[in-house]
Amino acid sequence: MEKYLSVVKMALERGIVPRCHFEDITRADFYGFVVPFAHALAGLSEEAGIPIKIRCCDTLGLGVAYPGASMPRSVPGIIYGLRHYGNVPSSLLEWHGHNDFYKAVSNAAAAWLYGASAANCSLLGIGERTGNCPLEGMVMEYCSLRGTTDGMNLEVITEIAEFFE
């Protein structure tokens, strides 16, 4: 942890706004490592007056979106825990999920619902192994949750898919 923090500190000293990736968070020691690491980053951020974003990476797609799922695989628990035990504001939390077990959309939606301000996506879910969270899936999830398209033209999803074919 100290080596990572020293790199973040050097970046902050040079005025760089860091985004720290909490890789493999769904297999990590959440309370023994993740929360203390978030606290240490918050201290550096406060000292430098520069916000530090935290990207929660479900590196192997092992996250579980349902309330009550056990840690460290619980997406609601991870986001809730970082917000309430790690004191990380929603505006500095983002979710980066992989689709190895076809849960990328439900996990990203759970991260949103529990307070992450962003979910990383790719067109058609294209990415390593079985892919990332498909942007078009999250667009549909957003519309379902909000009850509106908010002016988005959903017809372009078909056009994009046809272009990629």
Language model features with spans:
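Catalytic cores and adjacent flexible loops of soluble metabolic enzymes
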Residues: 1-165
